[in-house]
Each structure stands twice: as C-alpha cells, then as structure tokens.
Amino acid sequence: MKKIFFAQCSILLLMLGSCSKMTEDMTPESVNKEASVKSATALAGSNGVCIAYYITDGRNPTFKLKDIPDKVDMVILFGLKYWSLQDTTKLPGGTGMMGSFKSYKDLDTQIRSLQSRGIKVLQNIDDDVSWQSSKPGGFASAAAYGDAIKSIVIDKWKLDGISLDIEHSGAKPNPIPTFPGYAATGYNGWYSGSMAATPAFLNVISELTKYFGTTAPNNKQLQIASGIDVYAWNKIMENFRNNFNYIQLQSYGANVSRTQLMMNYATGTNKIPASKMVFGAYAEGGTNQANDVEVAKWTPTQGAKGGMMIYTYNSNVSYANAVRDAVKN
C-alpha cells in the first residue's frame, strides 16, 4: 500500500523496513450504477470523505486508534492481517502488527469507540499470489475464502467492511499489454511488481461482493486501494466498478495536474463515477503536505471527487489533520 517514487525504494527499505508499491515515477449497468453513485456520495462532505489508514505496528504510541479525530469518516486497519483476527492466539497483543494494542479486547474496545462516534472501521485485505489459484489464502475455493472473510470481518469482529490493497506480486499478464501513456493516465508505465487479474483472481473479488459493496445486502463497505498502473486495474474496474463503494488511488505526491489526468482515465476509459474516486495523501512520508492539501481541496473537471485517503494517519498526525481539514472545511 505504501506507494513512493520507485527510485526511493532502497532508501525507504532502510527507513520503513519494506517498500510496497507506490508510483514508480511521480513525474511528468444502470441500476447498479445509480445505487453505487448514491452510496459513494452518502458520507461525503464539502470535498468528499476522509478515509484514514491506521497502521497497527505500535508507532506513535500516544495516538491510539480511538484518538482518530472527528471529520474522519472511515478508518482502515492496516498491518494487522485477517488471519490474526481469525485466530487471536497466534499474535499476542503488544507484539508485531498488534503492537498498537495491549490485547484483542483492547482492539475491540477501541473499534467500538470509533463506531459509537459514527466512524466506520474496515479491515485491509491484501491481494496475494494465491488469488491466481483455485485455493486463495489456502482455502478450499474462492467461495470458502469469501465466506471466511465474511465470518471474520462481519460476524466475529462486527466491522463495517473491507478495503482491497491491490498491488502485490504474482504472475504477470502474458503478453503484457501496451501501456496507454502518461498523458492518458497520469502514470509513465506499468508497475512491474503487480500481478495479472486472471479468471481465478477475479473470482475471489466476485465472491467478496456477495458480502461487501453496493450490491451486497448488508450495507458493508467494499473499497479498493490501487493504481491505474497495476496490471489488474482495468479488468477489475471492467468487472466490479459498480460494486465498490469507493475506489482509492495511491496517488501519493501527485499534484492537481496529475490527479486530473488520473481522473480523466478513471471516469473516461474505466467509466467510474467521479464521486467514487478517492485520492491518496502520504502522511507517513511527510514531504508532500502542500500538494496533498491542494488535491484535497481540488474539484475535478468531472465534478466532485469521492474524497481523500490518508496513509498512515498515526505516522504524522499534524500532516494528516491538515489534509483532513482541507477535505472537510
């Protein structure tokens, strides 16, 4: 989920411990669709929704999950994996990606505190090479995987949905298609660390739409965080754009000129309503606040955007608050 300049990855590996996808180069259906657009605008403020990623590794220990401020609409738990929520005996509280919580009871209490204030809490779900197989996540089938995610996220933890982090490695398309180009997309080329949306991969998302998203019967959020430069992007949008409540672009560091190019492609080629499109602010990096605030205030030529997501809110709270204020004020 952490998208940065490709050239800076080696530096960030030392600083952050890993370098997941960021932009490689930061330079120069009617019924379902109608329901989907209404869902996407329901929470929006003057410049859309504010979505906060909260990384659970224990950083900034004085800023708890429950301290997420008002005017944040949704929080995505990031770092902590669904299998730790499934079996709470394997990762003790206060360790690893449970570093932000003394115990699972502490986690539960803080989740309820946010929900009592009207803030939705979602679980991040990473795509995985196993999604390209008949046994995603080691489950017997895509249907079994979808059932398990529903059981963990909805039944056990009473969360408000999931967000798919689509950027991880697996088999690439063969042949790799020609990239549309910077002027068309706001990106210079494919992100080579991503994987193809094979039929099996798409079937995993299809199973998740039974329980999450605009066509599910329970009002649970289905979001995606990815990039137009990800190999799977176009096929996912072709098949599921109407199912997502919000579509987050990991557009970290981009200025308004560049995000407008992204919006042009998303609304034109991908036929995504502008009101679903959420753009990314990289609080963790801490170096692009002026651009992020400008993008947060920006109204695209297509009309109001969906809003902004902030990665990771608890890494740099003053930076994150500035972006939130730009979205909501």
From Swiss-Prot:
Active-site residues annotated for this sequence: E167 (proton donor)
Domain GH18, first and last residues per copy: 48-329
EC number: 3.2.1.96
Compartments where located: Secreted
Segment forming the signal sequence: 1-39
Post-translational modifications reported in the UniProt record: Carbohydrate at Thr-88 consists of (2-OMe)Man1-4GlcNAcU1-4GlcU1-4Glc1-4(2-OMe)GlcU1-4[(2-OMe)Rham1-2]Man.
Entry keyword Transport: no
Glycosylated residues, chain numbering: T88
Keywords, in A-Z order: Glycoprotein, Glycosidase, Hydrolase, Secreted, Signal
Transmembrane segments: none
GO biological process: carbohydrate metabolic process
Pfam families: TIM-barrel_EndoS (PF23916)
Main subcellular location of this protein, as a coarse class: secreted
Reaction(s) the record says it catalyses: an N(4)-(oligosaccharide-(1->3)-[oligosaccharide-(1->6)]-beta-D-Man-(1->4)-beta-D-GlcNAc-(1->4)-alpha-D-GlcNAc)-L-asparaginyl-[protein] + H2O = an oligosaccharide-(1->3)-[oligosaccharide-(1->6)]-beta-D-Man-(1->4)-D-GlcNAc + N(4)-(N-acetyl-beta-D-glucosaminyl)-L-asparaginyl-[protein]
CDD domains reported in the protein's UniProt record: GH18_EndoS-like (cd06542)
Entry keyword annotation includes Isomerase: no
One GO molecular-function entry: mannosyl-glycoprotein endo-beta-N-acetylglucosaminidase activity
A GO cellular-component term linked to this record: extracellular region
Subunit structure, interactors included: Monomer.
Family to which the UniProt record says this protein belongs: Belongs to the glycosyl hydrolase 18 family.
Function: Endohydrolysis of the di-N-acetylchitobiosyl unit in high-mannose glycopeptides and glycoproteins. Hydrolyzes bi- and triantennary glycans. The presence of a core-bound fucose greatly augments endo F3 activity on biantennary and, presumably, triantennary oligosaccharides.
Protein name in the entry: Endo-beta-N-acetylglucosaminidase F3
Organism field: Elizabethkingia meningoseptica (Chryseobacterium meningosepticum)
Lineage: Bacteria, Pseudomonadati, Bacteroidota, Flavobacteriia, Flavobacteriales
Gene that produces this protein: endOF3
